[in-house]
């Protein structure tokens, strides 16, 4: 009889993309896979006809006044009822949670159906939903060994498996990376929401570098309202550019880059490390539990990146840091060597081994 796994996840890129990657893996292995997410996450899987999905609502009850907390709990309660209906209908063999508040209801309800729950944490600190779910999960799988605010009592069921990236990234050949192009290519990644500050600070810095006589090619993600002005700026200054809001062929963009300037979502930084792309990390200052800074700090401690805090993210500091990387090719090569020590190409096999006793 074919085994069935329900994957539950929040709808942000850092949650939904690892979930989709693992769903594709188990689907190819012959499992039935279903997704429970919010409307944002559901938009990402519309093109996957093989995946059945359910949309739930969920809100965080934290940092709200009493009335809004009450409304949030009503939303969560309604999603718990819907989760009971889903589990009775689908009769899965395993629940696999990726965090985000929408993952909480069905993961919580799984306890009362005696279903094994596995949770996965992509960041260097346990997210709030995963923190609650850790209590009754069978195993906690983590991308990296978490030591920050991690409950000691859960360490016995915690296993490091690595980042669940697209297999094209995990399996790509390092020889495809072209670090000797005529133009020095810089990739700007603002995360799933874009980053307005990148659109303000980066273009004048690229102009300054271009004026120094260096041939620069810029590949820049931006928010929609900035796109026309950024494109016109680069065109006016004769700077080769590709400016985009979203591009599904992100691997090709990464592979064509010598350096990245990026927010610090766990998946994005892991993709850069797997493709040996040195990066300047600019953590989102208001990320939940400061997880973006902690993600970046892990890689900085392992010699894989530079950190430039948003308070210090100005044209002078960014110009000096980029110029340092352009002039010192040995430093870039040292970072690439460090990156080779900081990824796991066997993540899918390791996950299979960790869950096989439950399915």
Say what each PLM segment does.
Residues 24, 36, 41-49, 173-260, ...:
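Donor-nucleotide binding loops and adjacent catalytic segments primarily
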Residues 65-94, 112:
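An amphipathic, basic-hydrophobic alpha-helix
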Residues 92-94, 239, 255-270, 277-278:
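Acidic donor-binding loop of glycosyltransferase active sites
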Residues 302, 306-309, 313-330:
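C-terminal "capping" alpha-helix adjacent to the active site of nucleotide-linked donor transferases
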Residues 331-345:
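A short, well-ordered alpha-helix in the C-terminal region of glycosyltransferases
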């Amino acid at each position: 009889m074919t085994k069935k796994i329900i994957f539950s996840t929040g709808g942000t890129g850092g949650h939904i993309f690892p979930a989709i990657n693992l769903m594709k893996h188990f689907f190819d292995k012959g499992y039935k896979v279903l997704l429970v997410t919010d409307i944002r996450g559901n938009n990402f899987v519309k093109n996957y006809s093989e995946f059945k999905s359910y949309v739930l609502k969920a809100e965080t009850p934290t940092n709200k006044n009493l009335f809004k907390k009450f409304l949030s709990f009503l939303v969560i309660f309604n999603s718990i009822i819907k989760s009971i209906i889903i589990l009775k209908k689908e009769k899965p063999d395993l629940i696999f949670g990726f965090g985000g508040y929408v993952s909480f209801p069905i993961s919580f309800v799984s306890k009362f159906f005696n279903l094994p729950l596995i949770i996965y944490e992509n960041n260097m600190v346990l997210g709030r939903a995963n923190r609650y779910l850790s209590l009754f999960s069978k195993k906690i799988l983590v991308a990296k060994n978490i030591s920050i605010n991690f409950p000691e009592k859960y360490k016995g069921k915690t296993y490091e498996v690595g980042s669940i990236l697209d297999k094209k990234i995990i399996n790509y050949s390092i020889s495809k990376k072209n670090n000797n192009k005529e133009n020095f290519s810089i990739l700007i990644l603002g995360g799933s929401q874009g980053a307005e500050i990148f659109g303000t600070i980066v273009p004048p810095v690229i102009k300054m570098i271009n004026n120094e006589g260096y041939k620069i090619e810029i590949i820049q993600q931006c928010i929609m309202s900035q796109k026309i002005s950024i494109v016109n700026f680069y065109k006016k200054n004769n700077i080769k550019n590709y400016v985009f809001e979203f591009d599904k062929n992100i691997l090709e963009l990464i592979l064509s880059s010598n350096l990245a300037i990026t927010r610090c979502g766990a998946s994005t930084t892991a993709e850069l490390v797997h493709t040996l792309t040195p990066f300047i990390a600019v953590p989102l200052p208001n990320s939940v539990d400061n997880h973006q800074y902690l993600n970046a700090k892990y890689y900085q401690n392992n010699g894989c990146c530079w950190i430039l805090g948003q308070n210090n993210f100005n044209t002078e500091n960014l110009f000096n840091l980029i110029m340092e990387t352009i002039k010192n090719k040995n430093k870039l090569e040292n970072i690439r060597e460090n990156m080779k020590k900081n990824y796991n190409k066997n993540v899918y096999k390791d996950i299979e081994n960790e869950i096989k006793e439950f399915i």
